[in-house]
């Protein structure tokens, strides 16, 4: 096999690959053995048609696609290794010669990982951020504790108010016609959560159980449905039931119920200590993130658009998984937020671009500084993870290995060591 790499522009180039005729004929043999099993010719059992008869009846060309499916992945992979390039997307393949008894010739247009020209990454300065724990932050944490231990109590009578869980039926109409996706029954909605289109939840306040109301809202101009975007709609709503949070009193009894402490003062002291530990971690994370962002800003990188799109794919998927944990789907989110996937991707694009830039920058710094993740480093990381998840390190290693995760773990450790270098060489100013 012969391969030639020619860079065309920016991060794109063309691999011209030539595969020996003997390999082509061998692939055609494999293709025939596969295809003939599905062919029925009078006078022959299925799968027993002679090769010459098959070719005279159907043509050898009928085997070409199956032979290409056999040849292309292996030839392309070998050519990539020989050329020493790192593709970041599937290639565009153009077969220029495919014929029995002749060499296979094809061209693969490839987008490759970009070159990173590092700027300053040592001695970077960042301004210190205030992460101090105040009485107000302790009180806010205790308030959240109250919220978590609040009891949802059915409201027998009275009007809906902000903070209530309203169970409603609703149906939306535009110009008097019901529109698709605008109807639900017994839907639980926390008033004030901002889940629905602006103005919807506010108009439910004051509604009594069993009452019906017509609510008028205006869809956002950028709403994913052009039939509704920027237009007024009327929702017919019925309030079926209400639940209200019954907040526990912050006293010694509360402390005993929710913790191992006997008094509220002890609980406050412990809460403050935990917040200080948490903010210390947040400060460390803030410093690391700021240094990485500065190093990435100082680097020159011509980002391939496809790398950003792949990152967006992952981010949208992650967002959908977070919604599922909250009992919502992406489809419902699009419906109630007035966005579609394209708009969500646009909203996430800046973060996706930053993530790709920082990843490439850290990889380049790691290479420049010869930073590697050793087996000892990875074993230490496995021990740390074992402590977090309460499982033996050997068991975690087996899990990572079974899921092809060890390479990713090595990369994560290498990245952490690279950021450690940035921190060690940095200056944090007040």
UniProtKB/Swiss-Prot annotation:
Cytoplasm recorded as keyword: yes
Principal EC category: isomerase
InterPro entries named among the record's database cross-references: PPIase_dom_sf, PPIase_FKBP_dom, Trig_fac, Trigger_fac_C, Trigger_fac_C_sf, Trigger_fac_ribosome-bd_bac, Trigger_fac_ribosome-bd_sf, Trigger_fact/SurA_dom_sf
Location in the cell: Cytoplasm
Any single GO CC term annotated in Swiss-Prot or TrEMBL for this entry: cytoplasm
Gene Ontology annotations of biological process type: 'de novo' cotranslational protein folding; cell division; chaperone-mediated protein folding; protein transport; protein unfolding
SUPFAM superfamilies given in the database record: FKBP-like, Triger factor/SurA peptide-binding domain-like, Trigger factor ribosome-binding domain
This enzyme's EC code(s): 5.2.1.8
UniProtKB keywords: Cell cycle, Cell division, Chaperone, Cytoplasm, Isomerase, Rotamase
Reactions catalysed according to its record: [protein]-peptidylproline (omega=180) = [protein]-peptidylproline (omega=0)
GO molecular function: peptidyl-prolyl cis-trans isomerase activity; protein folding chaperone; ribosome binding
Cell division as UniProt keyword: yes
Recorded coiled-coil stretches: none
Functional description taken from the UniProt entry: Involved in protein export. Acts as a chaperone by maintaining the newly synthesized protein in an open conformation. Functions as a peptidyl-prolyl cis-trans isomerase.
UniProt free text on domains: Consists of 3 domains; the N-terminus binds the ribosome, the middle domain has PPIase activity, while the C-terminus has intrinsic chaperone activity on its own.
Family that this chain belongs to: Belongs to the FKBP-type PPIase family. Tig subfamily.
Name the record gives this protein: Trigger factor
Protein species of origin: Brevibacillus brevis (strain 47 / JCM 6285 / NBRC 100599)
Gene name tied to this protein: tig
């Amino acid at each position: 096999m012969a391969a030639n790499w020619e860079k065309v522009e920016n991060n794109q180039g063309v691999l011209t690959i030539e595969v020996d005729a003997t390999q082509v004929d061998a692939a055609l043999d494999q293709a025939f053995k596969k295809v003939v099993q599905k062919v029925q010719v009078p006078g022959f059992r299925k799968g027993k048609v002679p090769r010459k008869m098959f070719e005279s009846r159907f043509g050898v060309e009928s085997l070409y696609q199956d032979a290409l499916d056999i040849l292309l992945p292996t030839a392309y992979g070998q050519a990539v290794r020989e050329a020493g390039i790192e593709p970041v997307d599937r290639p565009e393949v153009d077969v220029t010669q495919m014929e029995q008894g002749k060499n296979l010739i094809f061209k693969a247009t490839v987008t490759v990982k970009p070159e990173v020209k590092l700027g300053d990454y040592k001695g970077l300065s960042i301004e210190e951020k205030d992460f101090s724990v105040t009485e107000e932050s302790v009180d806010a944490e205790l308030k959240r504790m109250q919220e978590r231990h609040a009891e949802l109590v059915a409201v027998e009578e009275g009007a809906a108010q902000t903070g209530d869980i309203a169970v409603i039926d609703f149906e939306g109409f535009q110009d008097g016609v019901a529109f698709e996706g605008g109807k639900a029954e017994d839907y639980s909605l926390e008033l004030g959560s901002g889940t629905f289109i602006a103005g919807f939840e506010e108009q439910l306040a004051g509604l009594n159980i069993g009452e019906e109301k017509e609510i008028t809202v205006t869809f956002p101009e950028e709403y994913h449905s052009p039939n509704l975007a920027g237009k007024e709609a009327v929702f017919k709503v019925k309030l079926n039931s209400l639940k209200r949070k019954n907040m526990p009193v912050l006293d010694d009894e509360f402390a005993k119920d929710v913790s191992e402490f006997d008094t509220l003062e002890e609980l406050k002291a412990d809460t403050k200590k935990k917040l200080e530990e948490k903010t210390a971690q947040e400060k460390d994370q803030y410093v690391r993130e700021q240094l990485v962002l500065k190093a990435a800003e100082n680097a020159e990188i011509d980002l391939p658009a496809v790398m950003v799109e792949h990152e967006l794919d992952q981010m949208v998927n992650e967002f959908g998984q977070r919604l599922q944990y909250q009992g919502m789907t992406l489809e419902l989110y699009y419906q109630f937020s007035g966005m579609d996937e394209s708009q969500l991707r646009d909203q996430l694009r800046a973060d996706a671009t930053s993530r790709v830039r920082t990843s490439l920058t850290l990889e380049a710094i790691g290479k420049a500084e010869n930073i590697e993740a050793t087996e000892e480093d990875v074993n230490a990381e496995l021990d740390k993870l074992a402590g977090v998840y309460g499982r033996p390190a050997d068991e975690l290693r087996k899990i990572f290995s079974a899921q092809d995760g060890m390479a990713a773990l090595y990369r994560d450790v290498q990245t952490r060591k690279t950021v450690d270098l940035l921190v060690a060489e940095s200056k944090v100013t007040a």
